[in-house]
Structures are given as structure tokens and as C-alpha cells.
Amino acid sequence: MNRKVGLFFGTFNPIHTGHLIIANHMAEYSDLEEIWLVVTPHNPHKKKSSLLDNHHRLEMVYRACEGYGKLKPSNIEFDLPQPNYTVNTLAHIQEKFPTNDFCLIMGEDNLKSFHKWKNSEVIIENHEIYVYPRIAPGKVADEFKTHAKITRVAAPIIEISSTFIRKSIKESKNIGPLLDEKVWKYIDEMNFYK
């Protein structure tokens, strides 16, 4: 029987406790056996100029995942043509790891715009989607409200953003509680976001 692996995509610029709480909750309170935190080199929907280099963001994810046995950093998208789309990554990763059943993890906010994703119908036909709650305007398209391949997980609502953290660091605010200690140390040592 194949292993169920959740894919939690993000720029992780930087990874913060909100990401870890969601990933760990999915690992512990759903039927997913492992969560891969997939560092995206360039999200087609975000400005690239604000991103740290891929290897720095991956290093922060490695540091953040230490001590969480079911959380695994992944750079699977780094060698794919850019800009990349989730449907392409899923096809690539399923071919590379055929003994895993890959599922998407996304916030309710992303589910609301999922129908606009490239080949969203192919994604949902071939992969389950695990959704965690987010506070966001708008509503989920009717076709996804009760879809058989969508599982809603009652994870804590965490309203922390990497944008807020970057801005706070630039303003010399103490954001220690929002970051894993090893991640904060790396950011401080490397003088990032100042």
C-alpha cells in the first residue's frame, strides 16, 4: 500500500511558527503519514524580487523541521522549468516517487481561488486536497464545497505572514516567538530582511 504524503508548498520567506503548526497538525491529526515542505523557487503569483535565494530559504526549512520526524524539507521544484505550476510538480514528483500517494495541503484562502489554477481539474482528479482554515474574504466555488477528494482538517487558525515578519525585522521588532529559534538565529547571523 502506498504511503500518503502531504505536500505543503510555500516560498517560506521565511518559514515561521504558523507554517510549522499547520504542517505538524496535518502530520499528527490527519491520515497523512509525512509532510513535505516544498520550497518554491518562484511562485507565479508573487513578486520574485522579495525572495531570498533558494538555498537560504531551504536552509531555514531544514532548520525549522529539525525535531519533527514527520516533516521533511523538499527542493523538488528547484530543477523544474520556471515559472512552474503545481500540476507540473505533481506529475514530476509522482513519477519520481511512485510508491507515494501525494496530497496537496492548502489554506481555505487558496481553495477559494483553486478553480483558477492551471489544470485544477487534473490536480483534483489525481490528488486529494487537505484544507486548513484561514480567515479570508470570498467564498469557495460550489464544486469544491463538498468534493469527495477535499478533506477539511480542523487545524488552528494561524494568522501570521512572512510579509509581516520581514517588515517587523526591518523595523527591529522582537519577533522571536513567531520563528523557530534556529531559523531566527540563521536570519540574524545572515543579516536578512534588514
Swiss-Prot record:
Protein name: Probable nicotinate-nucleotide adenylyltransferase
Function (record text): Catalyzes the reversible adenylation of nicotinate mononucleotide (NaMN) to nicotinic acid adenine dinucleotide (NaAD).
Keyword Nucleotide-binding: yes
GO MF, any single term: ATP binding
One Pfam family matching this protein: CTP_transf_like
Catalytic function, reaction form: nicotinate beta-D-ribonucleotide + ATP + H(+) = deamido-NAD(+) + diphosphate
Encoding gene, per UniProt annotation: nadD
Pathway: Cofactor biosynthesis; NAD(+) biosynthesis; deamido-NAD(+) from nicotinate D-ribonucleotide: step 1/1
Keyword set, alphabetical order: ATP-binding, NAD, Nucleotide-binding, Nucleotidyltransferase, Pyridine nucleotide biosynthesis, Transferase
InterPro entries: Cyt_trans-like (IPR004821), NadD/NMNAT (IPR005248), Rossmann-like_a/b/a_fold (IPR014729)
Family to which the UniProt record says this protein belongs: Belongs to the NadD family.
Known EC number: 2.7.7.18
Organism of origin: Christiangramia forsetii (strain DSM 17595 / CGMCC 1.15422 / KT0803) (Gramella forsetii)
